[in-house]
Amino acid sequence: MSTQITSESPDGRQRRWQMLSRFRRDRSGSTAIEFVALAIPFSLMVFAILESCISFAGQQVMSNITDDIARQLRTGQIRPADLDKDRLEGMICEQLEMIVADDCPGLEVDLQEYDTFAEAAAVRIKLTGTGDNRDLDTTGFNVTPGPSMSKNMLRVFYKWPVMTDFMRKSMSNLKDGKTLHFATVTWQNEPFDD
C-alpha cells in the first residue's frame, strides 16, 4: 500500500478563498449578537476573578501589617504605655490605605494581655444579628498591651466591601454586602525595660 502526497488543487484554494470572502461580506449581525451574548458573562467572570484576587491581596497585606506591628510590640520597639486605640489604628491604616479607602472606614482592632495562651486561644469572633443583617460584635474590644514578658493577642478586622453585584450574595458575610477580613497574632513579649 503506497501513500500518495498530492498538493492542493488550485480549485480547492479558490473555493476556500471564496468562502472566506463571503463570510467577510456578511453583515447580517449574527456574529455581533453572538459576541455580545458571550462577552457579557465572560466580562462578569473576569471582574469576579479580579475582585477575588484583590480581596485576597488585601487580606495578605493586612496579615503582614498585623505581623509587623506584633513584632514591634513583642520586642519593645513600641512601648505599651505609648499605645492607645487611635495610634494603633493609625499605624495599621497608614499601611493599609494603599489597598482600602481613605481613613480605613471598616477597620476594627483588639489588642489585649492574657494570663495564658489557652485563655487567648479561647477568644472567638462574635457576630451580631442574623442573615443579611450580621455585623462584627466589638463588645469587649480594647487596646491594652501588656508589659515585658506578658502574653498578648492582636486581632485586626476589616469590613471589606464586595463590589461585583452578582458575587455579593456568595462572598459577603456581613450586612451591607461586606465580607470580614481578619488577622490574628498571639505572642509573649520579650524581656525589655518597661
State where each predicted segment sits.
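Alpha-helical assembly-interface signal, strongest on the long, hydrophobic N-terminal helix that forms
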Residues: 2-95
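Short, conserved structural patches
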Residues: 2-10, 68-194
